[in-house]
UniProtKB/Swiss-Prot annotation:
Keywords: Cell adhesion, Developmental protein, Phosphoprotein. Gene3D superfamilies: 2.30.42.10, 2.60.200.20, Phosphatidylinositol 3-kinase Catalytic Subunit, Chain A, domain 1. It comes from Mus musculus. This is Ras-associating and dilute domain-containing protein. Residues 1000-1085 form the PDZ domain. Residues 226-237, 916-927 have a biased composition (Polar residues). The lineage of its organism: Eukaryota, Metazoa, Chordata, Craniata, Vertebrata.
Length: 1099
């Protein structure tokens, strides 16, 4: 029997049944358990229906693909012979067998309910066996599966499971059934006997087979090198798969010997292959899953291409721009003969993109030389090495490798040497997305990310998932495995706690509603704000779950290959994998719980408004076709549509995965169709729709609803779950004279969705409502006679809802995407600045003069002065260019000073493995914020520090081709090169253009407002249009934030750009922007701040 975890979920109001969810850790299927079935109506109909609703929503979900398992269906009307401890004919009586406790006694009966715990049942059973209940700790209740045998034969137990003290035996009995041919009974056993049995049954195989699997997995990951030509004659050559370069090769035995001798040295024949045969070393690839690191060229001819059903190249590359046959590499023997005369010739195929040393080769064959760089398509870059030609790489090859562009680690922009020519467009890379932090600020960072986005705002709703995935990526690549493991568990726990708090608050609000609940006391508008938070974290949890599921094994494999741990290496990575599985299980639980809660409350809304559709007043049929353009929807139908429309809008606004959104709406359709059909079949003639005129009206109402569903793109699920109700209403809308002439067989063909029992029930109630005598033609025929009188088949069950399956594709969080949403990137910049603030608080005495305090946020650069062109201003308007480069005179005078460190001190950067780090020059202009930005301005200082270096130039206009800009559209995140040489240091405006830093700040209005005085730049010596900060009130929100300083320019207010906006209009936007406001601010240099401080004298 699989282990189980029982979680009580719904903190519902007192008159709504609390549902529970059973999460199966290893069950292959997903099922929905229930303890209630629908019965004829009672006086308290609302309470009964709520119980049905709650139990319908008790279900499980798995990120694996699962189908509904018929073995978990509820028991039938008769007693189940496989259950020896319970009988349906005697509910509430549990037989506890105690052969091993009291000799000569077969069993004792105790009373139990579904909520009875195993510990309490042990106490009751001991009392029935005349034993002391105080000794309950010496006994355990066991779930025993075995064969009862025929009469006279003894019970033969095959396996048993000990119940935990707080487990619910009857609930487990309902959900887990023994397989066919076996029976189950509950036994009372002594704990000492159970422990003795457990000590004898020692598992000696699991650890061995798992160790064997790990060894085989490591060998498969490292691959088996191809043999030399001598060895290849006796065995076919094999590809080197996922090896490492020749400088870090470790001995690896062949596959058959790996299981027995994993630590033996590699045979000389295999090592000789890589050190003597030419090979291609992968420098840049496309797919981590499919690319090899080394391709050994040991054959006479190699084909390079993309593997297809009709093409199977010897070197398979997976990039989309690789042709099925891209090029061939063949061995060419020169006329001189001998080994020295053997060369490899690259022969490109027509139409294939092939470059050697960054030069297109066209159709001409090329003789490969040791150290050549091969570019295949846009993604693959390989280094050709031929140990037979030369051992060290030639100087020209090293120069080409050194010419690869460096990138700023903060913004991903390409850096180039000062005065060097512009790089070709093909080499310019997009900015990388990184979020670097230290382990000591991990908790603070997670808390800030969790509270960063308001679900009701305009920000990208998947920003938390995106930022948390960046945290996971950084931790996996730079921290120890233990830190990575703890981070996964922290993230899953914080998400789970957040969802639980939001649902708890919603339940407390719902508990205050007075019964009976009506539409007036339970409006959808009041429910939407609370559902926003639940759906918000459900959407982010789905993205996080998929990311961890896909990336965590790759990260663990990378750690295993790179980290050198002795002794407990296997246990360390085993713990990491276990933590990854626990995090995925927790996130899966969040998705399930959030799904259940949302459907629960939405179904309550529908339960209130759906019955009115069956009792709707007359309506104007001639306006039926124009209901979209005016208030033609009747009030009863408008309420139902408003619930579905609000749900659809919420799912789209919160960027829920489309497959999960469709499943949630399918649930609501299923519930609505089942509820209305059961009411028609249950209430019968008491409903006005059984009279023909009202039946026509109700049928028309349903058609209007289906029309709305089709217009919203939900036609298929709506028609599926309303099919039986539609057949029922069409029958009631059929004229009486026409209906009387139909025979039973004709009715079965005309209304095929109804089973015989439901059709017979409808016809019987139709006769009562119409006061007409029995109609002989409506009597069930011989084939349908027995089924027509089965009363249990009349009402539809809530136990067969549409399945819930997590999606496997279509996710939006992709850290390797070419570009990212502007809103997400703005928040990434804010989080980086937030981390800067934390570093400043951690070392307030060090100041900017100690670069070691900000270690890890610099880009490591080789010897030489570099200047970067990047750090763009991420524009909120995706239709506009994010960054363009302009000549110096066209740039607004904005800038900021750089923090200068003491001479001779240079920061070093170490990685997670403690590798060596040398003294390196750093591009200090890549800092997101000067560590000490002054709040006020003191012009009496002796001198103003001049900025140096360059990390980006931003133009705030939206033209695609500004003066001096590059022709054509500029993609967001691309690094742009100057069309003109940089201005000389003596230029009056160069100091204001060398630095442009843009950040986001959120301020909450205080008693005295925001506390900053603004001025139009045209009325200052600056003479530039724009809104600038002239004064900061001490103690105000603006001053307390710590990032704003005099002279800073306000670019946006709550997402609205101030470009071209008048001063009065900009001030009005700030004055009426609400209590919490968000500003996009550009830092200014000291020269600009001095000019902003003074106003022009009146002319």
């Amino acid at each position: 029997m699989g282990s189980s975890i029982f979680l009580g979920l719904q903190p519902s109001p007192s008159h709504w049944l609390k549902s529970s969810v059973v999460i199966h850790e290893d069950a292959p299927t997903m099922f929905y358990g229930t303890q209630l079935i629908m019965s004829p109506p009672t006086k308290n109909k609302l309470k009964r229906q709520s119980q049905l609703l709650s139990t319908m929503l008790s279900r499980t979900l798995s990120y694996k693909y699962r189908d509904l398992d018929s073995t978990f269906c509820s028991l039938g009307a008769s007693d189940d012979p496989s259950e020896l401890s319970t009988q349906l004919s005697a509910p509430g009586v549990l037989k506890v067998f105690g052969d091993s406790v009291c000799t000569g006694t077969h069993y004792k009966s105790v009373l139990a309910t579904g909520s009875s715990s195993a510990q309490e049942l042990v106490k009751e059973a001991l009392e029935r066996y005349a034993l002391d209940p105080e000794c309950a700790g010496q006994y355990v209740l066991c779930d025993v599966v075995g064969q009862a045998g025929d009469s006279g034969q003894r019970w033969q137990a095959q396996c048993f499971r000990v119940f935990g003290d707080n487990e619910k035996p009857l609930l487990i009995q309902e959900l887990w059934k023994p397989r066919e041919g076996l029976s189950r009974r509950f036994e009372l056993r002594k704990k000492s006997d159970v422990e003795e049995l457990a000590s004898r049954d020692v598992d000696t195989t699991t650890a061995g087979i798992n160790a064997q699997a790990r060894r085989l997995q490591r060998i498969r990951a490292k691959g088996t090198p191809a043999l030399t030509s001598e060895a290849a004659q006796s065995s076919p050559p094999t590809r080197l798969r996922r090896t490492v370069s020749e400088t870090s090769l470790s001995p690896a035995p062949s596959l058959p010997e790996a299981a027995q001798r994993p630590e033996e040295p590699v045979p000389e024949a295999m090592r000789y292959s890589l050190y003597q045969c030419p090979h291609l070393l992968l420098l840049q690839g496309y797919s981590q899953q499919h690319d090899s690191l080394v391709y050994v060229l040991s054959k006479e001819r190699h084909t390079v291409g993309q593997r297809t059903p009709s093409s199977k190249p010897s070197i398979s590359l997976s990039a989309p721009d690789i042709l099925p046959l891209h090029c061939t590499i063949r061995r060419h023997q020169s006329p001189e003969g001998g080994p020295a005369g053997t060369r490899l010739v690259l022969e490109p195929i027509t139409g294939a993109s092939v470059s050697v040393n960054f030069s297109e080769v066209g159709r001409n064959p090329v003789v490969l030389q040791h150290g050549d760089l091969l570019s295949l398509g846009l993604y693959y870059l390989l280094l050709f090495k031929d140990p037979g030609q030369a051992q060290p790489l030639p100087a020209c090859a090293l120069a080409r490798l050194g010419a690869a562009p460096q990138s700023c680690r903060m913004c991903g922009a390409v850096l180039r040497a000062r005065g060097a020519p512009s790089l070709p467009a093909a080499v310019v890379r997009r900015r990388s997305l990184l979020l670097e932090f230290e382990p000591d600020v991990e908790d603070t960072l997670l808390q800030r990310i969790m509270t960063l986005i308001e679900p009701g705002g305009d920000d990208h709703k998947l920003t938390p998932a995106f930022l948390l995935c960046l945290c996971i990526q950084h931790s996996a690549m730079h921290f120890q495995p233990g830190t990575f493991r703890h981070l996964l568990l922290k993230i899953s726990k914080r998400v789970r706690d957040t969802v639980w708090e939001k649902t708890k608050e919603l339940a407390e609000k719902q508990a205050q509603l007075q019964e009976p609940i009506s539409w007036a006391s339970f409006p959808m508008a009041d429910l939407v704000p609370d559902l926003q938070h639940i759906l918000f974290w459900m959407s982010n949890s789905i993205e996080l779950l998929y990311f961890i599921q896909q990336k965590s094994p790759l990260y663990v494999q990378s750690m295993e290959e790179e980290l050198d741990v002795t002794g407990s290496k296997e246990s360390l990575f085993s713990c990491t994998l276990t933590a990854s599985e626990e995090a995925m299980a927790a996130l899966e639980e969040v998705v399930l719980y959030a799904f259940q809660q949302c459907v629960y409350y939405l179904s309550k809304c529908l339960y209130v408004c759906l019955p009115a559709l069956l009792e709707c007043p007359p309506f104007q049929t001639e306006r039926r076709e124009s209901w979209r353009s005016g208030p033609a929807l009747p009030e009863e139908l408008r309420r139902v549509v408003s619930v579905f429309q609000a749900t659809l809008d919420l799912l789209q606004q919160l960027q829920m995965h489309p497959e999960v959104a469709s499943q949630m709406l399918a649930y609501l359709f299923f519930f609505s169709g089942t509820l209305l059909l059961n009411q028609v079949l249950d209430k019968g003639p008491s409903l006005s729709c059984f009279h023909w005129p009202r039946g026509v009206q109700v049928c028309a109402r349903l058609q209007q609803f289906l029309e709305w569903a089709r217009s919203a793109g939900l036609g298929a699920p709506a028609e599926r779950f309303f099919r039986k109700l539609s057949c029922t209403l069409h029958l009631l809308a059929t004229p009486r004279a026409q209906l009387i002439q139909m025979s039973w067989a004709t009715l079965r063909v005309t209304f095929p969705a109804l089973n015989p029992a439901q059709l017979h029930r409808l016809l019987t109630q139709y006769q009562l409502a119409s006061a007409m005598g029995p109609v002989s033609a409506w009597e069930p025929g011989a084939p349908d006679g027995p089924e027509a009188f089965q009363s249990e088949d009349i009402l539809e069950s809530y136990e067969n809802p549409p399945p819930i399956v997590l999606p496997s594709q279509g996710f939006q969080v992709d850290l390797e995407a070419d570009c990212v949403e502007d809103s997400i990137y703005q928040h990434l910049l804010y989080i980086r600045h937030f981390l800067w603030g934390l570093r400043g608080q951690a070392s307030p005495d060090s100041g900017p003069a100690q670069p070691e305090s900000i270690e890890g946020l610099y880009h490591t650069i080789p010897e030489g002065h570099l200047e970067g062109h990047g750090c763009p201003l991420a524009n909120r308007d995706p239709g506009r260019v994010a960054v363009e480069t302009a000549p110096p005179h066209s740039l607004p005078v904005t800038g900021a000073p750089r923090a200068q460190g003491p001479p001779g001190r240079q920061p070093t950067r170490g990685d997670r493995r403690g590798s060596q780090a040398g003294s390196l020059h750093t591009d200090s202009s890549c800092m997101l914020t000067p560590p000490s930005t002054p709040l006020g301005l003191e012009p009496a200082g002796p001198s103003w520090p001049e900025p140096s270096g360059l990390c980006g130039r931003a133009v705030l206009d939206g033209q695609r081709n500004g003066p001096g800009g590059l022709p054509g559209a500029v993609l967001e995140g691309d690094a742009i090169q100057d069309a003109e040489p940089p201005a000389e240091a003596s230029s009056p405006s160069s100091s204001a253009e060398d630095f442009c830093y843009v950040f986001m700040v959120e301020l909450e209005r205080g008693p005295s407002g925001l506390g900053m005085g603004l001025i139009d730049g045209m009325h200052t010596p600056l003479g530039a249009q724009g809104l600038y900060i002239q004064t900061l009130l001490p103690g105000s929100p603006a001053a307390s934030d710590g990032r704003l300083s005099l002279g800073d320019q306000i670019l946006e207010v709550n997402g609205s750009s101030l470009r071209g906006v008048s001063y009065m209009r900009a001030v009005d936007l700030i004055r009426h922007g609400g209590k919490k406001m968000r500003f996009l601010v550009a830092k200014s240099d000291m020269e600009t701040a001095k000019k902003i401080r003074f106003r022009n004298p009146p002319s």
